[in-house]
From Swiss-Prot:
CDD domains: Ribosomal_L29_HIP (cd00427). Pfam families: Ribosomal_L29. GO terms for molecular function: structural constituent of ribosome. This is Large ribosomal subunit protein uL29. PROSITE patterns: RIBOSOMAL_L29. Transmembrane segments: none annotated. PANTHER family: 60S RIBOSOMAL PROTEIN L35/50S RIBOSOMAL PROTEIN L29, LARGE RIBOSOMAL SUBUNIT PROTEIN UL29C. Belongs to the universal ribosomal protein uL29 family. The gene is rpmC. NCBIfam families: L29. One of its GO terms (biological process) is translation. InterPro entries: Ribosomal_protein_uL29, Ribosomal_uL29, Ribosomal_uL29_CS, Ribosomal_uL29_sf. One of its GO terms (cellular component) is cytosolic large ribosomal subunit.
Length: 63
């Protein structure tokens, strides 16, 4: 997800998106630990998406 798309969302939507991404990250980590994750690049992708959402939330908090 791009930062420009995230900036168009409300704070409530961003918080929901953040919770969803954190749940997805948890599930991917569990799958990796049990050896069921073949696409390890997804962990990095989700991590970067979480960082993008947090950045936009901080930008909105500063306004």
């Amino acid at each position: 997800m791009k930062a420009t798309e995230l900036r168009e969302k409300s704070v409530e939507e961003l918080n929901k998106e953040l919770i969803d991404l954190l749940k997805e990250q948890f599930n991917l980590r569990m799958r990796k630990a049990t050896g069921q994750l073949n696409q390890s690049h997804l962990l990095g992708k989700v991590k970067r998406d979480i960082a993008r959402v947090k950045t936009v939330l901080n930008e909105k908090a500063g306004q």
